Amino acid sequence: MGTEIEKKYRIGSAETARLRERLRAAGAEARGAEFEENILYAGPGLERGNRVLRLRRVEGRAIFTFKESMADSSGIKRRREDETAVDDADALADILDALGYTPAVVYEKRRETWLVAGVEVVLDELPFGLYVEIEGEEEPILEAERLLEIDGATEEPKSYPQLTLLHGTKNGALVEARFTAKQKDS
């Protein structure tokens, strides 16, 4: 069992550009940018304990993840996180469907990943906003906040699925946040 420890902030486009400059100045390692499609499922056992099953498709590969919230009052999110690579995402989706799990939330994301000061810093663009997440252990997260001068930024307590439910488009039982064709090209 793994544990995800992270802090998230909502930022604007000017702050995104400043963060890239601060990351470069701090000697951060750029790990590249990717486009993701994230599908979260509803079904048996997920309604209790804030549990999530997610199938993420990224650049021709897929990752299947189980997440479960853990109690914490520090302002840093902690969640159980178990994930595995999937060879055939379509087959897994069929298996989940056969077991009674159905897609409930879908969101697309452009993610730029950096490594600095012992943490992973990601700059995320979703159809409804720009965000930065810092993931690692608690002390290095706080150190990275200071190094990158984002400790005064507005924290975002909601998860991307929660934000998708607020800002996405309802399509029957499914809520989606997808880029338009024009947004995908930019």
What are these regions (language model features)?
Residues 1-119, 154-186:
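N-terminal strand-loop-strand beta-hairpin
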Residues 142-154:
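Long, well-ordered alpha-helical scaffolding segments within enzyme catalytic domains
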Residues 123-127:
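A contiguous pocket-lining binding segment that forms or flanks enzyme active sites
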Residues 130:
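Catalytic DNA-binding helix-loop module of base-excision-repair DNA glycosylases/AP lyases
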Residues 16, 141-142:
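Short, well-ordered alpha-helical microsegments
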